Amino acid sequence: MKYDFAAIEKKWQDKWEQVKPYAAVTGDKRPKFYGLIEFPYPSAAGLHVGHPRPFTAMDIICRKKRMQGYNVLNPIGFDAFGLPTENFAIKNHIHPAIVTQQNIKNFTRQLKMLGYGFDWDRVIDTTDPQYYKWTQWIFLQMFKHDLAYKTTMPVNWCTSCKCVLANEEVVEGVCERCGAPVIRKEKSQWMLRITKYADRLIDDLDDVDYIERVKTQQRNWIGRSTGTEVTFKTNTEDDITVYTTRVDTLFGVTYTVISPEHPLLKKWKSIIKNWDEVEAYQAAAARKSDFERGELNKDKTGVRLDGIEVINPATGKVVPMFVSDYVLMGYGTGIVMGVPGHDQRDWDFATAFGLPIVEVVEGGDITKEAFTLKDDTGIMVNSGFLNGMTVKEAIPAMKQYAVEQGWGREKVNYKLRDWVFSRQRYWGEPIPLVNCPKCGWVPVPEEELPLVLPQVDSYELTDDGESPLSKMTDWVNTKCPKCGGPAKRETDTMPQWAGSSWYFLRYMDPHNDHEPVSHEAENYWGPVDWYNGGMEHTTLHLLYSRFWHKFLYDIGVVHTKEPYAKRTSHGMILGQNPHYVGNVSTQEEKDALIAKYGNQALRPAVKMSKSLGNVVNPDDVVKVYGADTMRLYIMFIGDFEKVATWSDDAVKGCKRFLDRVWNLADQVTEEEGVSEKNAPIVHKTIKKVTDDIDTLKMNTAIAALMAMVNEFYSNGLSRGDFEALLLMLSPFAPHMVEELWEQKGFAAKYEGKMAMQCAWPEYDESKTVASSVEMAVQVSGKFKGTIIVPVDSDQDTVVEAAKASEKVAKAIAGMQIVKVIHVKNKLVNLIVKPC
């Protein structure tokens, strides 16, 4: 009978919908396993083939865990607030809530089409007021604990989205979402004090099983360093403070640089003789993003502050001060010291402005470039009492001296900045605060939550960059919850990251009207046992959610310090490049492609995009090949953690494999147990597939199943052999397996249980290695047949077995064996001559 995947897949999806085999039970006595994927943003385009890669992998892991006796929570939801939906609503004049529900409906259809074993009774939607009620509640607890505050500051402003971006949302000077240029702009913003948790966010990484790349990225982003704060006297009434990790180089300081945003500049306005020049430079710097001022800032610019003098505390010499946009107010003190002899950026700046360059660590030629050490073994020179010391010795010596002299103190510094939390957009969680002229910022009473996002006539941004909510005077004007006087609601909304910072907790208890999650549910399910997600979220969602979880731990909502016990990541799936030079034959055509598309034309595969027309829609794949083929291929495509390229031809190969499994059913004998002949390959494959799923080596697990099927076609197979195959294949291709399981009578054998409800097969280590082996036999180099002998048989045993073969005995009749060539477990060659 032909494998009719369309009918079979619908049959079993309908059955799963009815019997709910994926329902998780809080408090069950079985050991729990909580497997989590990053919930998707429900875009209008629907799922693309990038989504199924992590979804399928976690589904396989969770299916195996169920079969191993675990009570599994494998939930799904939708991270549905955000700019794309709002922009779509503005363009098409439709409410974003309507768009969101349409998109969620389509995503749900696609997820069920692919046979994922989610617990559909636990679905969450971040735009549901009953969900964001608790997002607002958590924010209010942060406000009450002084972790949320409002301040006017230079922020990242997306010129297209017309809203504020967190530092983490700016990539190479452009908006992470839309790619538009990002500039700096002064705005009043709500902030969250994530910096108060910086040490814990670094230190607790030692207690979790994250892939090393994730840990490294988070440590680098937080950027903890131990150094010294050094006070420099000036010719004004103000001292300045500089943070450095290389206090040993103070004797080499020949200038200082202040950030254009530093408040001292305005204070010194009457002292700075070239103020107009400085003010113009400040204005130019304000139009640049941090990335333009740092990474892209190859040409060092600046203005010397005429009238400001700074005294180097180590040498007593006067050094000049400059204002330059490469110094950011957000890191350190907003003032840096220039050591041009040993920092290339400082050397470039000093060279550009004709400043002295002093060598304080010997070993390089500072007339050509800065001498930067790779280690701390350099010898100090031109450094007073430090001369002759190694850098390693000089750092603590100079630090101690600075502290004793009263112009230095030890300081731990961080690159991490507080989280810019408010957005001047409509489609987000309303911030539940009101501003009262008498009482200041006052929380909306908890019993009034959720503060529901009101309907508006227009989602267009205001000309001054304020939220569309600011135009709704009836909603904005309210009474102060504290004094009853007139007050105004906050009109900014929360960022998209708010709802995703705690969603994993809501899955544990999604219908609780009284608290975000009950202690009973959180104590049972927490922490998440395995969380898989994209590397692009390491310094965004992953860091934010760890921060929120630690706060919830501090106030007693959760019992674990970390939300996720394990974190893995997956590689992107690329599409075929329609502009690849390999697609054309003539050199003229190749040159034309390179001229038009540059280096992109040299890459056979690129990121999928609508503009390139290389996006692969799962609907199209499932329609032609079926969901099981799609699932199998997406796991067979390559190393899970690495980038892979989609190939239609390879999809066909996976379909052929499933066809072979389907047709194999007709060859099954009535022998109940695992056959003796197939026992080694069966037990070996069980071990391989079990280990490979646990280590995300899905491609090699599938290869092992393919090899076993080949053996079955060669050896024949028993019911026990086929049963083992179906159980192992079940997590990968659940629809077809359940159909074969039912057709071959295994469901009846196990009292109506589906394959997914039966125990995962176990292997016998002693049977993973074959007890016998088939060897080729040659007589004087000519093949005469094969023999079966015990594994690792010695030469005498092999020769006797060969001689017992009828064909060999006939070939050596009347001959004398003069030499034996024996390749253990593979071949024996009897060299003969006439007697």
Predicted regions and their residues:
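Conserved oxyanion/phosphate-binding beta-strand-loop segments in alpha/beta enzyme cores
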Residues: 1-36, 66-75, 99-106, 279-323, ...
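Residue patterns forming the tRNA-binding/recognition surfaces of aminoacyl-tRNA synthetases
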Residues: 2, 11, 18-19, 91-248, ...
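Long, charged, mostly alpha-helical binding arms that flank functional sites
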Residues: 3, 224-229, 237, 362-365, ...
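NTP-handling and nucleic-acid-processing catalytic cores
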Residues: 3-13, 49, 135-362, 468, ...
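N-terminal catalytic cores of NTP/NDP-binding nucleotidyl/phosphoryl-transfer enzymes
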Residues: 24-94, 100, 123-138, 244-245, ...
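Secondary-structure transition/capping motifs at alpha-helix termini
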Residues: 27, 63-71, 91-97, 113-117, ...
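Helix-rich, typically C-terminal accessory recognition domains appended to large enzymatic cores
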Residues: 79, 144-156, 410-439, 496, ...
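Long, His/Glu/Asp-enriched segments that create or flank divalent metal/ion-associated functional microenvironments
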Residues: 443-479, 485-489, 495, 776, ...
